[in-house]
Amino acid sequence: LGSEGRLTKGDRAGGTDLSSRAILDPREGDVEDDAASTKTRSLLAIGGALISEISFPKLALAWVLLIALPAVVLGATPLVAKIWFVETLDRISAVAGIGSALILALVAGVGWFGLPHLLRVLERSFWSLNSIAVQPGYVLAREVLRHVLEGVAGPRMGEASRARLRAGTSAAAGGLSALVALALIAMAWPYTRWTGELADLAAPLRLVKPALANAVVLVSACLAVASLAWGVADAAMDQLQTTRTFDEGAQPGRTWRVAHLSDIHVVGEEYGFRIESGRAGPRGNRRLDEALHRLERLHAARALDHVLITGDMTDAGRAGEWAAFMTALSRRPALAERTLILPGNHDLNIADRGNPARLDLPTSPGKRLRQMRALSAMDAVQGARVRVVDRSAGKLGPTLTEFLRPHRASIAAFADTGSLRLSRGLESLWENCFPMILPPAEPDGLGVALLNSNAETHFSFTNALGLVPALDARALLSVMEHHGQASWIVALHHHLLEYPTPAKALSERIGTALINGSWFIRQLAPFASRAIAMHGHRHVDWIGSCGRLRIVSAPSPVMEARDDEPTCFYIHELAAGAGALRLLAPEQVVIGPRSRN
């Protein structure tokens, strides 16, 4: 720029980089890009900043809708149920013969057809309760004990000793959490009331106090029982072990090459930074372009069977980010036709990338909109290849594209208007799309199950919680049972359990693994010898096992490094063995800071 701020002759000729001449180079970002960066700020600092940004009226409304109202409903249920039961019996007993039978049949029919949705609601409430009370209390106690004891033992502790310590701390944490819960029950019990009368419905406000006391007792009882159950189950099950050796590849049999990427965090701007890393991480999407370029060359040299991306395709689930991801993939049709994707927490649970303190109310269209963006992308990438599960028959149903065809107009209308009515109608559609199954090509081939492991959260700061719904797990197991000779990749975003490696900080150990991870591993146990779980989420390069189940954790080819530092991903080779799926030594693909060769 000249002295008056105009472009000089040399600048007009294209020889000057205006950004580099600016006082603040916009490509380098600024403090606003570090608002939620865990790489440059502590969780305490981020949490402190959130307090000044939170909308407290909105927080109060969210607290009422998500905690207080469910607690009152939960606590009032025994009172209202008693009233309803007595009144219903009185009326049924007054109806002669056939009338009584018809009423009972009607009640049974409503229960039968409403049961699947009711189970979803009950399960979501149960695991919401776990994520609010049981999981934080139990996991906090367990991980604090582990962190302290592993710190005392030091790095010389062997893997077998660490496994025993982790089993013992699980049992101890369950006992401590149960004792705290019993103390809460003792405090609330004098204010409880478990029977009601019809007259109580005329003055419902007088039920609030006993209902809240009932809720405290019920929640605490759940905490006591669940903590003990989790502690015993976690202590008794096989502990995670790091894999030191891999299976040999010389045996005859079918092999599959699977490129496993995760957490690519596509941004919608050429110089955009990521939420987690801020200025401590890379800008733009150059690393993704480099990874796809390398994959193209590797595929041309030796064909890949699958390109699996286990979540966090985008940084915040915005439309521009999905557009950038699909544009990059569209340029490489040979990769696109064998790519499989599943949702991560950044694809679904970031309410506002610029403001971590923002809340999504249960009535907000934002969450459903992010789900529909992800579903639309999954349909475009793999809809004609993967199939949904017919839960009533316990076997594979139509392809994802066929399943969504009757709902395309509703999805488009909701994306255009954000209508609450349309949003409610799309809730069950989203839930029933999982697990998505790429069936094995032969009876003894390799199938891929794509799960949604994201718990429903309404706050960016708690976006990372994970959960595999029991209905989804049962659907997966029924398909695996139906294809009795096949091998399986069970793909999800969240890590099943905390890694069996020492952590530098306590914050690294808490709140990001599956809430019900140990339960899910036990469900997979009958199929463990012919299944491999693949996930991402924490950007940790780790391969291990839990009993017979092999587990592969993918590093991020994008995160955990600046632009001038290398990253990597892996190509895994799987081989069919005698009744088992073998994992051969992986091939590491390094993404250099500037190279393209």
Regions found by a protein language model. Give the residues of each.
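Beta-strand-turn-beta hairpins that frame and shape the catalytic cleft
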Residues: 247-259, 266, 431-450, 484-487, ...
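Extended active-site neighborhood of metal-dependent phosphoesterases/phosphodiesterases
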Residues: 243-247, 324-475, 557-559, 563-564, ...
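Active-site neighborhood of phospho(di)ester-bond hydrolases with catalytic His/Asp-centered motifs
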Residues: 260-262, 305-312, 338-345, 451, ...
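Active-site environment of divalent metal-dependent phosphoester hydrolases
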Residues: 267-270, 315-317, 345-353, 456-459, ...
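Active-site-proximal segments of metal-dependent phosphoesterases and phosphodiesterases across multiple
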Residues: 455-474, 481-530
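A short C-terminal boundary segment appended to hydrolase-like catalytic domains
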Residues: 574-597
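N-terminal active-site segment of His-dependent metallophosphoesterases
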Residues: 17, 21-102, 112-169, 194-324
